[in-house]
Structures are given as structure tokens and as C-alpha cells.
Curated annotation (Swiss-Prot):
Stored Pfam families: Metallothio (PF00131)
GO biological processes: cellular response to cadmium ion; cellular response to copper ion; cellular response to zinc ion; detoxification of copper ion; intracellular zinc ion homeostasis; negative regulation of growth
Domain writeup: Class I metallothioneins contain 2 metal-binding domains: four divalent ions are chelated within cluster A of the alpha domain and are coordinated via cysteinyl thiolate bridges to 11 cysteine ligands. Cluster B, the corresponding region within the beta domain, can ligate three divalent ions to 9 cysteines.
Family: Belongs to the metallothionein superfamily. Type 1 family.
Function: Metallothioneins have a high content of cysteine residues that bind various heavy metals; these proteins are transcriptionally regulated by both heavy metals and glucocorticoids.
Binding site for a divalent metal cation 7: 50, 57, 59-60
GO cellular component, one term: cytoplasm
Gene this protein is translated from: MT1M
Binding site for a divalent metal cation 1: 5, 7, 21, 24
Binding site for a divalent metal cation 2: 7, 13, 15, 26
Assembly information from the UniProt record: Monomer.
Name listed for the protein in its UniProt record: Metallothionein-1M
Keyword Zinc: yes
């Protein structure tokens, strides 16, 4: 398991294609971990908090 990922399911944290970890901290995460973040937001992989589906998350405001 990747030490940077809090996800308990799966052998490793493979965030490159589909990040399903709500608290994914993978540096290799190339997809936003929450739906309100743009795909290019790297900070979304580090403790992103969504306020709503149509709003920006706290790290991408």
C-alpha cells in the first residue's frame, strides 16, 4: 500500500486513472479527487474539501 494514501482498499493507491480515495494524498494523482475540482489542480490530491458540487473546493478557490 502507498504510504501517502489513506485508502484501505486495494493493494496500492493507483490514482492515475480513477481516484476513489476521499483522502487521497498520492503525489501521482493526475485526476482531481473531488468532483468540484478541475482536473489540473494538483492540490486536490492533498486534503481537498468540497463545499458543493457547483462550488470550488477549499484548495482550488
Amino acid at each position: 500500500m502507498d504510504p501517502n494514501c489513506s485508502c484501505t482498499t486495494g493493494v496500492s493507491c493507483a490514482c492515475t486513472g480513477s481516484c476513489t480515495c476521499k483522502e487521497c494524498k498520492c503525489t501521482s494523482c493526475k485526476k482531481s479527487c473531488c468532483s468540484c475540482c478541475p482536473v489540473g489542480c494538483a492540490k486536490c490530491a492533498h486534503g481537498c474539501v468540497c463545499k458543493g458540487t457547483l462550488e470550488n473546493c477549499s484548495c482550488c478557490a
